[in-house]
Swiss-Prot record:
The lineage of its organism: Bacteria, Pseudomonadati, Pseudomonadota, Gammaproteobacteria, Pseudomonadales. NCBIfam families: PRK00430.1. This is Putative Fis-like DNA-binding protein. InterPro entries: Fis_DNA-bd (IPR005412), Homeodomain-like_sf (IPR009057), HTH_Fis (IPR002197), Trans_regulatory_Fis (IPR050207). One of its GO terms (biological process) is regulation of DNA-templated transcription. The keyword Cell inner membrane does not apply. Gene3D superfamilies: Homeodomain-like. Belongs to the transcriptional regulatory Fis family. It comes from Pseudomonas aeruginosa (strain ATCC 15692 / DSM 22644 / CIP 104116 / JCM 14847 / LMG 12228 / 1C / PRS 101 / PAO1). GO terms for molecular function: sequence-specific DNA binding.
Length: 104
């Protein structure tokens, strides 16, 4: 599948088994993206040393969302319209998130 097909919206990523497979295929280190996140969270909780923690969801979301946005923007050579279509986000929402992570 080409990027143009993705950007045109003809085949949502969630419906494409080949694209989803790239996210669940182990890396050279043998870990999927899911495995990496799980390992990082286990490591995070193991090193809290009794400190109270809140807002883990937002912490994880920020850690994943920032590199996702940066990588997509690099892939589309800074074209926000293409990036918003590729991500399935409203262009205004994309701009807000890019500003949030100092990527704009």
């Amino acid at each position: 599948m080409t990027t143009e097909t993705l950007v045109s919206g003809t085949t949502p990523v969630s419906d494409n088994a080949n694209l989803k497979q790239h996210l669940t295929t182990p890396t050279q280190e043998g870990q999927t993206l899911r495995d990496s996140v799980e390992k990082a969270l286990h490591n995070y909780f193991a090193h809290l040393e009794g400190q109270p923690v809140t807002d883990v969801y937002n912490m994880v979301l920020c850690e994943v969302e920032a590199p996702l946005l940066e990588t997509v923007m690099n892939h589309v050579k800074g074209n926000q319209t293409k990036a918003s279509e590729l991500l399935g986000l409203n262009r205004g929402t994309l701009r807000k998130k890019l500003k949030q992570y100092d990527l704009l």
